[in-house]
Amino acid sequence: MISYEPVRGMKDYYGEELHKIKVVENAFLKIVKLAGYQEVETPIVEDFQLFALKGGEELRNTMYVFKDKAGREVALRPEFTPSIVRFYLNSLQHLPKPIRLYYLGTVYRYDEPQFGRYREFRQAGIELLGSSNIYSDLEILQILIEIYRELNLINKIRLKINNISLIRKILNKLNISDNLQEHFLHLIDKGKIDEALSLLPSSEYTELITNILSVNNLDISSYNKIKEDLTEKYNLKDLIQDLDRIMLLKNILDNLGVNSYIDLGFVRGLAYYTGLIFEVLHPSVSFSIAGGGRYDNLVELYGGPQTPAIGFAIGVERTALVLEEPNTVKEKQNKIGVIVLSDEAILYAIRIVDKLRSNNYIATINLKSISISKLIPSYAEEGYSFLIFIGKKEYEDKTITLKNLSTKEQVTIKEENLLDYLKQII
């Protein structure tokens, strides 16, 4: 017998839960369109090597990977950025820079399912390709902030930021290979600090990395101390610009009234980040609800010209989880049920329904075969605001009988007055 449950790690959505998801998506779409971003859609199925090239074979265990009927190894996309870069290289290189793109769709990861983590989930994100200056960092952060302001969450969230370039440049000084660097950062991301540090040779730079990773809330005192050490103790003046850049971003976020902090031990799980990285946190959940960063080398890694880029992805379902109570996010819906009491009135009733829908009212014709005494409470329970009764008399007189399910008031009015009457009472 077929199971009625969705496949493990997948989830059905309906009602209020789905409504909140749509609220998040609509807020995202509103802001990114106003910011001048263009929509792009890419396939769910991609060549596995698109993701493995930078992430390595260890990605295989967390992805849906399979061979198609032609024997090609393909995967369900675990994220969007590699697909966007592939599309850019295939179709958009000729356009003037920077290029602003947005996407919205499902991604797939073979993780262990738990609260807030499913194997299929939605991501809404943007990518800005062709700019490396700090203004592009600010543009991305500003758009992210505006989306959460639109969702009335700006005073609840906290933005965690870092510049991964600091750690990468020190690892380069230690002559750590790219593959070992990714493994090191992967361990840091999983909280396995000691195991990660054990991979490094004994060196003063290893000591520096240890010290930097321990700074989880950079203040002016620790900022000045690290700058002094980079200059006088380690002779790494070229790293100061990376430290200054993240500190400048933090100061700007402060001036914008955004709750943010710099965690120098923060790294993100994706292997391609090269500069600014960030995550959005909310106190009601233990996981991030959005994140992103700069990936200046990914286009070149895929065989294209050196092209700086930055972007973010919002976890749509995760953000929906932390929305306020339904009445603060739910659009006012005035659902109207139309009850046809006479067969000869059906065409008249259809015309009424069409008029209501054309004026943005939710209207349905009754299909329930139950008595009027049971019909009225059933519609009230389903969230309807009004019922319209249309019988032989209403059809002949071109009137409708309207019942307000909140006040219990019932009136009979002319058809041509219906819309004006509804505007007065809603």
Swiss-Prot record:
EC id: 6.1.1.21
Gene Ontology molecular-function annotations: ATP binding; histidine-tRNA ligase activity
Keyword Aminoacyl-tRNA synthetase: yes
InterPro entries: aa-tRNA-synth_II, aa-tRNA-synth_II/BPL/LPL, Anticodon-bd, Anticodon-bd_dom_sf, His-tRNA-ligase, HisRS-like_core, HisRS/HisZ, HisZ
Family: Belongs to the class-II aminoacyl-tRNA synthetase family.
Main location: cytoplasm
Gene Ontology cellular component annotations, sorted alphabetically: cytoplasm
Cellular localisation: Cytoplasm
Catalytic activity: tRNA(His) + L-histidine + ATP = L-histidyl-tRNA(His) + AMP + diphosphate + H(+)
Keyword flag Hydrolase: no
Gene Ontology BP terms: histidyl-tRNA aminoacylation; L-histidine biosynthetic process
HAMAP family per record: His_tRNA_synth (MF_00127), HisZ (MF_00125)
NCBIfam families for this protein: hisS
Keywords recorded for this protein, A-Z: Aminoacyl-tRNA synthetase, ATP-binding, Cytoplasm, Ligase, Nucleotide-binding, Protein biosynthesis
Chain segments annotated as coiled-coil in the UniProt record: none
Pfam families linked: HGTP_anticodon (PF03129), tRNA-synt_His (PF13393)
Superkingdom of origin organism: Archaea
Protein name: Histidine--tRNA ligase
Name of the gene this protein is made from: hisS
